[in-house]
């Protein structure tokens, strides 16, 4: 898949999104910062990437996801948990960054912060019904199928 990428900050030419390995699903996104950003516990910040994408094809969307190491080791996750980039969006990719940890975290310029995953999209059409066909689960949820 070819994807249109617009470089909004010339410094990002040296830090284009890339797959870390041949088997990686996510492209690493970096913080396009002029100086280190300190996030105290509980702080949030909207961090620019210096990049914009245009998927153009309504059969695709992009997800911005946290990097597992930052979340597990430092408590750095996405403030919105998952960022959804629609196919017609053309603005800068921003990363809502939240320090849910117990200590300050310093995010350095051009540090890998999140990952971008391209996913297929199915746009549903609703069929209005009065009742559903019976299923084994029915309306059971929130642990109704058991714990183990």
Swiss-Prot record:
One GO molecular-function entry: dUTP diphosphatase activity
Catalytic reaction(s) noted: dUTP + H2O = dUMP + diphosphate + H(+)
EC number: 3.6.1.23
GO BP of this protein: dUMP biosynthetic process; dUTP catabolic process
CDD domains cross-referenced by the UniProt entry: trimeric_dUTPase
Pfam families assigned to the protein according to its UniProt record, in alphabetical order: dUTPase
Family to which the UniProt record says this protein belongs: Belongs to the dUTPase family.
Functional note: This enzyme is involved in nucleotide metabolism: it produces dUMP, the immediate precursor of thymidine nucleotides and it decreases the intracellular concentration of dUTP so that uracil cannot be incorporated into DNA.
Listed name of the protein: Deoxyuridine 5'-triphosphate nucleotidohydrolase
């Amino acid at each position: 898949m070819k994807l249109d990428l617009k470089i909004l900050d010339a410094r990002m030419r040296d830090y284009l999104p890339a797959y870390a390995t041949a088997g990686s699903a996510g492209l690493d996104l970096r913080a396009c910062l002029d100086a280190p950003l300190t996030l105290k516990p509980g702080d949030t910040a909207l961090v620019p990437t210096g990049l914009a994408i245009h998927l153009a094809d309504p059969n695709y969307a992009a997800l911005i996801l946290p990097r597992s190491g930052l979340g597990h080791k430092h408590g750095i996750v996405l403030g919105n948990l998952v960022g959804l980039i629609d196919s017609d969006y053309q603005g800068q990719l921003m990363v809502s960054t939240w320090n849910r940890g117990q200590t300050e975290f310093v995010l350095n310029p051009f540090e890998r912060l999140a990952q971008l995953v391209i996913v297929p999209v199915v746009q549903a059409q609703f069929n209005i019904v009065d009742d559903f066909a019976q299923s084994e689960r029915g309306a059971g949820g929130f642990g109704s199928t058991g714990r183990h």
